[in-house]
Amino acid sequence: MTSTDAGSMRVAVAPDSFKGSLTATEVAAALAAGWSTVRPNDELVLLPQADGGEGTVDAVASCHGTGVWREVPGVRGPDGRPTTGRWLLLRDGTAVIELAQMSGLPLMDSPDPGGASTTGLGQVIAAALADGAKALLVGLGGSASTDGGAGALRALGAKLLDRDGREIPDGGDGLAALDSIDVGSLIEPPPGGVELLTDTTAVLCGPHGAAHVFGPQKGADPAERDRLDRALATFAACLGARLPCSPDEPGAGAAGGTGFGLSAWGGRLVPGAARIAELTGLSAEFGRADVVVTGEGQFDATSLSGKLVGSVLERCAGTATRSVVVAGRLAAAPPGIGISLSDLAGSSESALAEPAMWCRVAGAVAAARLTSTL
């Protein structure tokens, strides 16, 4: 570690996004700006993070200056309207794709848990492969659909047929009519493999499955969740008859079951936060940096179980690295220094009105508190 005797420290600033207000890159910049007003001699390393959901591609792009952005106009959004898909091509030929960008819930005018699909994701994957991508890194999270990744597989060449041999409708509800799947024209995965980044251990079906765990946030009432769960079970049976797959694999329920569909295609489910930490260089900072500053919109008990901030804190503990957590709201006490923007601003409303400013204030407060412990 860098010696604190010299009066300066190495500080890794590695927050998640503050959903609905600031991107991870914006949070990192604001925290660093505030920190520098108190400890101007510290070496600040800005490493915005993500866990596979919103902000995944931007986090990787911020640490890979040689990455090249690609656009795929006219792909099918989750509700059928056209949108533009974006993906990042890294120097080694890996395509980084974020499901939330072209198949995410924010793209919906109104929730449609049974009708929304992942077709756009599949179209972007197909475009990346056609462009020569040698490997895929797909962030799963923030999806609008509960279609098991059926839409993505269809865009990759699979045919989902009812008992009369007709194509079924898009969306999770359409899976109820599924009788067979033709994978004869399914595009092969790239030679370098497919990594599926997820922050959940949800399985495909049942009380701990995609429909029941994530259905409520997509607007599905209890009856709809039951219906979608049965439809996903039908999909699993039909796909399992053609491809090796496991609906009970942890993470299969990610992104409305897209983890299941793309793992059947050949993808490998991996913990998103840990993989992004590796890709961005954060993993190398544990034990090297004197302190890691992380954060998210709300820090609570669930933050410590599989989420990005919990993963960062676990790595800090394992390497005896000091930690700071900055959150819009602290609903639980972090193991190191914890700072709430709502407390600093006097209310959640005030913090949300000027989040960047309060992140700068939090950065300064964090630096002062840390200095007082040295």
Residue ranges and their predicted role:
Residues T2-L140, A144-L374:
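N-terminal loops that bind phosphate or other acidic moieties
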